[in-house]
Amino acid sequence: QAGFARMLGRAGLPGSPMIPAERALGSLLALKLFGSARHSHVMGYVFDEGLALWAGLNAIPKRAFLTEYSCRIDPDSYPRLMRAWFDALGRLGLAQGVSFDLDFHTIPFHGEDALVQKHYVSKRSRRQKGMLAFVVQDAGTRVFCYANGGVRKEDQNDEILRFAEYWKRRTGSWPEELVFDSKLTTYANLNRLNQLGIQFLTLRRRTRQMLDAIHRTPLSAWRRIELHGLSRAYRTPRILDEKIQLSDYDGPLRQITILD
């Protein structure tokens, strides 16, 4: 119903008479849904008739084709595909979200390219060469509505503003609420979001100075709340609700500190 083949054609994704673009993308998607972690693992599935049928082929393409496919894609194709996907979901009646989860994800790179920057890989708790991807997910529908797979380290702090501008162009209004980690952007950009009327929820960096201030807070300033409908072990945490000031941010910010 979304017209996936037409969408890929307008975006300019590569294909051939033997393996059109929608079949190539279908093969990659089939492997991902089946649980194959990497393209190099495809050789164990090339004789799986079910995966091939799902992708619309008589056999899943082999490792060499799938590995080089991304290198054949024009970088301008990704924004075109993203816009087409956004429009297609709108025609199908998918409601536009009001709250969005934002995050960076590092895709490890194991080659020798000197131009590839190092980024933090959370699963390995270290920095290594990789491509930094910025993804935005609708908190209500769980649909990914924005992505940029080529973020440079020097530009990553402003990526949140690029998403806000993209959403404004596509919908005519700014996103209502953004949820993200503390390392995603700067205090100055938080101030910019506030000026645009965009609400945000984020985690602060837990510095030594911040922790010392929390421990010096008298017990009378804390209050205990009860969380319902959750499976967490601690359902009655203590919270400290206060107003704070930050550098590069105009006006007060509401900060909620939680202790079990």
Stretches with model-predicted labels:
Residues 169-176, 195-196:
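Short, surface-exposed connector motifs at secondary-structure boundaries
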Residues 178-187, 206-209:
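Acidic, metal-coordinating catalytic cores used for nucleic-acid/nucleotide bond scission
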Residues 1-127, 133-153, 157-170:
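Dynamic "connector" segments at or just before major functional cores
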Residues 129-130, 195:
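Short, solvent-exposed loop/turn segments at the edges of secondary structure
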Residues 97-101, 175-177, 199-201:
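Structural preference for beta-strand elements that scaffold enzyme active sites
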Residues 45-49, 186, 207, 260:
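Polar helix-capping/helix-linker motif
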Residues 191, 196-260:
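An anionic, glycine-rich sequence signature occurring as long contiguous blocks
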Residues 37-41, 109-112, 144-146, 188, ...:
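Short helix/loop capping segments that flank catalytic or ligand/cofactor-binding pockets
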